[in-house]
Design a protein with these regions (language model features):
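GH16 jelly-roll
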Residues: 1-250
Length: 250
């Protein structure tokens, strides 16, 4: 087994989000970010903040701009992208009707969705205490393949891990395999998963996945992230940090 090295991480130290690592996506997006979500994403400390080395992403019931809810969505798109490796994050999720937290990845931004590829390390919804792990890509239309976990208490911290190489994408919960997909030689038109991806966290309110029947009495709700770390095989360096290309030839 090849030795792995840490290439990027955020331990969420300090008092504010590290904008050398993350960008906040703001607004309601086109057609509710393509999912008919109901929230307005902000960069306010009411919706995203760090306390005791924990990242908090909070969905709130409030009238803001033209929406009835606010939350936050962050991405490494402008700061860090990588191809292949291991991602680990220690996360606690909220449960509430109409809530949709996610830790996920998007691929090549020169392509529209689903051509760019999407890897959902975790999604959950409503009061379902289980994890949805999925991949989405283009194969004569939208192709989706995934798996739903057995019951786990998602409100407790669990380590969610992605292992990604030229042959497989595998997703683990506390080191137990939850999902895998074969991508070698672009099997099933999975060529999207051989490009560079970024990391994303968000908590949506409503939308196609959880539905729009929101339990306002249960809000606010928070996703908590203890850390996120990315490893690659020693010497590979298939990543981009702050637009500096370390290796773009594999």
């Amino acid at each position: 087994m090849k030795k792995k090295e840490l290439i990027w991480s955020d331990e969420f130290e300090g008092n504010t989000l590290n904008l050398k690592k993350w960008s906040c996506e703001i607004g309601n997006g086109k057609e509710g970010w393509g999912n008919w979500e109901l929230q307005y994403y902000t960069n306010r400390t009411e919706n995203i903040y760090i306390k005791d080395n924990i990242l908090h992403i909070k969905a709130i019931k409030e009238n803001y701009k033209y929406c009835k809810y606010t939350s936050a969505r962050i991405t490494t798109r402008h700061n860090f992208q990588f191809k292949y490796g291991t991602v680990e994050a220690n996360i606690s999720l909220p449960l509430n009707k109409g809530i949709w937290p996610a830790f996920w990845m998007l691929g090549n931004y020169s392509e529209n969705w689903p051509n760019c590829g999407e890897i959902d390390i975790l999604e959950s919804k409503n009061l379902e205490s289980k994890i949805y792990s999925y991949c989405h890509w283009y194969s004569n239309g939208v192709a989706s393949y995934g798996k739903v976990s057995e019951f786990i208490d998602v409100t407790k911290f669990h380590i969610y891990k992605l292992d990604w190489d030229k042959e497989y994408i595998r997703i683990y919960i506390d080191d137990k395999l939850n999902y895998e997909i074969f991508i070698k030689d672009n099997f099933g038109n999975t060529n999207a998963f051989h490009s560079y991806f970024d990391l994303m966290f968000n908590v949506a309110v409503g939308g196609n996945f959880p539905g729009n029947d929101i339990d306002d009495s249960g809000l606010p709700k928070e996703m908590l992230v203890d850390y996120v770390r990315v490893y690659q095989n020693e010497g590979e360096k298939n990543y981009i940090i702050n637009e500096n290309i370390y290796n773009y030839n594999n």
